[in-house]
């Protein structure tokens, strides 16, 4: 890719030199036909550059932003040269990227690969590992496993001596949300009782409260939480029949750096009004 840019620069310089040489010869008048020929050739060169450089630029951008296979190879090479915490950081970053591109099988293999490393690491890495598993289970629509992982997260939040990435109040708040979310996934949405509706209202309230926090946590996880709770608000409003609010929050899941598959389901729902797509 770099060679292609260097070649384009060389072509541009050659075309410019040819154009100037042709103009000088034409002005002198001694070899006028040769001068015209050089000018025409240089103009053709300029036209070729004008058509090829934008394509090259777009191809480079596409490679930088969308080549998940190249990104994967690069991250694995870096991880191979690292150990301990640095290796885990690189692999966790890779798993996020793979999940964002729906490479779920490879994400699962890497999660299994880092499991022994996580067991020997600090509680913060155990939490990150659980959140990655939660995201993977959500993408696979395995809500039973989501509930199991949420229970483990609650236990970690309540027993961990580390503050992980959260302030103390936010820490407790998140644990409470996860408890209600676990209950939410077990509801029978076709036959909601009064107590079921209380769970939905409480989860809706807690998620809105969490999103109103002004202090900033670690950027990556803060964005993940914002995405997750926008989604929870969307589907709780959906169960309450407030489609307008549901659409607002579900659309917000598309305005984050990480792909959330529920956004596609949200778009489908608002086209078909089929609630079963969510549950």
Language model: regions and residue ranges:
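Intracellular, membrane-proximal regulatory regions of polytopic membrane proteins
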Residues: 94-190
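Juxtamembrane interface helix immediately N-terminal to a transmembrane segment
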Residues: 1-14
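Transmembrane alpha-helices and immediately adjacent membrane-cytoplasm interface residues
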Residues: 36-66
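Long, non-transmembrane cytosolic or organellar matrix-exposed soluble domains/tails
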Residues: 194-279
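"A position-specific structural signal for the A-helix of alpha-solenoid helical repeats
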Residues: 58, 89-96, 125-135, 171-185, ...
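Helix-turn-helix repeat elements of alpha-solenoid scaffolds
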Residues: 30-33, 59-76, 98-113, 140-159, ...
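Solenoid-like repeat scaffolds
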Residues: 42-49, 76-86, 112-123, 151-165, ...
